[in-house]
């Protein structure tokens, strides 16, 4: 194991947010320099490269602090680089994020701003939150695979929308509209899948589903509050199940997905919580899963929580943004109306008095 390197290692995914991350990196670099943050940088060149970079940086180069520049997918790769090495305890490692683009669901849980200069100040301050990490075991052509996640995972419609969205990304189409278009297309074509869910060894669900989300944070899918009661340091995974529901009912409640109220407004929504979650599909291997925007392979899926296992840099207090005070209708009228005769006389009297006294 190498001697500890005190600098941050900035891992930049230049293709995040349809290339915005790479385009903005020179600006972000200068902001970090201006803030007095000492760092080295590495640019990813292909999918999952960040996993290799981070793992090697810990084991061979002694880095203990990482800044992820990109979106939730980049964060996920950095997390997997940290958790797929066994040389340095993950509790000794600190991670910060510099969110780029429109998704960035993890940062919403902690009110991390999108302004680069504000994020740099947060990183400089160094306030950390000891965060839980999810561990997912799934199957790829019969082989067991493991993937770690910071925020959330999903299957059913969730995974299908993720797949469609990623195809649109490759075509250079980005943003929230991209996600909503994918959502509508997938709702119209999705086929209900029968699953069974076990939580801490007890079967709690055996029915058809539209979608299932599993995670330790509240937001998923570009700002949707799919797990509104999730707490990222309670050692538990939250599960939200949307059963078979009519297209019209689901469409009528899409807006409620963004504030979390859908769990109380749609009878077909169930929520659970536990340390170990197992999802089995009928027939076997008929479902795929996604974690933070990356499509993975087949069921069954086993989820477990690694409690309080990494230090994440967050604001000590929410960043306050000054809002311009809105003028009242009376103030607007006064600002555009000519002065009245009485007002003009008063101003003249004041002026005369001033000149006389001087």
Regions found by a protein language model. Give the residues of each.
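Catalytic core of DAGKc-family lipid kinases
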Residues: 35, 44, 84-210
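Glycine-rich phosphate/pyrophosphate-binding beta-alpha loops
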Residues: 154, 158, 213-227, 295
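Short amphipathic alpha-helical segments
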Residues: 22-24, 79-82, 108-110, 225-226
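Short gly/pro-enriched beta-turn/loop segments at secondary-structure junctions
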Residues: 3-6, 129, 144-145, 188-192, ...
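ATP/nucleoside-binding phosphotransfer catalytic cores, i.e., glycine-rich phosphate-binding loops
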Residues: 199-201, 206, 226, 231-232, ...
């Amino acid at each position: 194991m190498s001697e500890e390197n005190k600098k941050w290692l900035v891992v930049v995914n230049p293709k995040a947010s349809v290339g915005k991350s790479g385009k903005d990196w020179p600006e972000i670099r200068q902001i970090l320099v201006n803030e007095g943050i000492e760092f080295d940088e590495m640019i990813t060149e292909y999918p999952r490269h960040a996993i290799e970079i981070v793992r090697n940086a810990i084991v061979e180069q002694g880095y203990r602090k990482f800044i992820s520049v990109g979106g939730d997918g980049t964060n996920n790769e950095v997390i997997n680089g940290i958790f797929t090495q066994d040389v340095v305890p993950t509790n000794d490692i600190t991670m910060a994020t510099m969110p780029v683009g429109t998704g960035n669901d993890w940062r919403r849980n902690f009110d991390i701003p999108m302004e680069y200069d504000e994020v740099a100040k947060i990183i400089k301050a160094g306030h950390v939150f000891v965060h839980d990490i999810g561990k997912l075991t799934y199957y790829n052509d019969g082989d067991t695979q493991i993937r770690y996640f910071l925020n959330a995972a999903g299957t059913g419609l969730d995974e299908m929308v993720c797949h469609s969205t990623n195809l649109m990304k490759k075509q250079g189409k980005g943003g929230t509209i991209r996600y909503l278009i994918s959502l509508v297309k997938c709702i119209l074509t999705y086929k209900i899948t029968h699953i069974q869910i076990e939580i801490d060894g007890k079967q709690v669900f055996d029915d058809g589903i539209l979608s299932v989300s599993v995670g330790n944070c509240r937001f998923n899918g570009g700002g949707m509050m799919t797990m509104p009661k999730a707490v990222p340091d309670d050692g538990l995974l939250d599960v939200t199940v949307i059963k078979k529901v009519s297209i019209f009912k689901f469409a009528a409640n899409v807006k409620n997905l963004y504030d979390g109220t859908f769990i109380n407004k749609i009878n077909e929504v169930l929520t659970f919580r536990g340390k170990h979650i197992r999802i089995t599909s009928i027939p076997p291997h008929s479902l795929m899963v996604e974690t933070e925007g990356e499509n993975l392979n087949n069921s069954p899926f086993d989820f477990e929580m690694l409690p309080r296992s990494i230090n994440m840099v967050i604001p000590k207090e929410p960043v306050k943004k000054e809002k311009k005070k809105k003028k009242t209708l009376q103030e607007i009228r006064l600002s555009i109306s000519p002065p009245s005769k009485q007002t003009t006389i008063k101003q003249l009297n004041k002026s005369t008095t001033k000149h006389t006294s001087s």
